[in-house]
């Protein structure tokens, strides 16, 4: 078994503290702790269940579900990816634009997932769709940046540096392939369609969310 864990961009550093990214992480952790206290009833109430949404109930869960997680490994993995790519995108867009970008990306991702299985009663939850939007935005904004990553192959562990285009591009292809395999599955699992939907949203709209200041610099080059 193996994997690649992104740690952060080594090609640039944000000009300011990524307060919004930190806030998003803290909110996710708070909600997860609340989940542990509330149990299954809390998860069912605030996760996005396609059959309920398409019957006209629980539309708010399209928003709330992006702050929910199924396990410690789920939230830790998501927050690692957010911390690896979020600060640079927050710096690029500005705090307010970045927050809107993140939230809308999460909503679009959740809609993509539930639209594929409108009659499913499986709860959909997780920040990965919104984070996929951040990754899509990062890919089109900083494709040549090097990402410090931990490469794990069985017992072999190594710090390596991988171009963002290669790392994120490969990740997206795996999600796209997996989404095609499970598009109509009714059982629980990874929300690949949310990843794909969020990523495409991020890649297509990231430039629109760039700060006015950065656009001015880019247009004058």
State each model region's role.
Residues 1-221:
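A detector for small-residue-rich transmembrane helices and their helix-helix packing motifs
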């Amino acid at each position: 078994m193996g994997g690649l864990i992104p740690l952060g961009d080594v090609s640039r550093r944000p000009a300011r503290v990524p307060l919004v990214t930190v806030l998003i992480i803290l909110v996710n952790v708070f909600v997860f702790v609340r989940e542990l206290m509330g149990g299954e009833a809390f998860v069912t109430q605030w996760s996005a269940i396609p059959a309920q949404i398409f019957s006209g109930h629980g539309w708010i869960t399209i928003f709330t579900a992006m702050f929910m997680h199924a396990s410690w490994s789920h939230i830790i993995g998501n927050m690692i990816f957010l911390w690896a790519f979020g600060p640079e995108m927050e710096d690029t867009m500005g705090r307010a634009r970045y927050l809107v970008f993140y939230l809308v990306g999460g909503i679009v991702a959740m809609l993509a997932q539930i639209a594929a299985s409108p009659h499913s009663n499986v709860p959909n939850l997780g920040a990965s769709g919104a984070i996929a939007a951040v990754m899509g935005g990062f890919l089109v904004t900083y494709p040549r940046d090097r990402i410090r990553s931990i490469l794990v192959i069985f017992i072999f562990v190594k710090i390596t540096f991988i171009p963002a285009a290669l790392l994120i591009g490969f990740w997206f292809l795996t999600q796209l392939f997996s989404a095609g395999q499970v598009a109509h599955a009714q059982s629980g699992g990874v929300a690949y369609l949310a990843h794909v939907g969020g990523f495409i949203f991020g890649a297509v709209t990231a430039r629109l969310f760039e700060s006015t200041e950065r656009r001015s610099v880019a247009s004058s080059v």
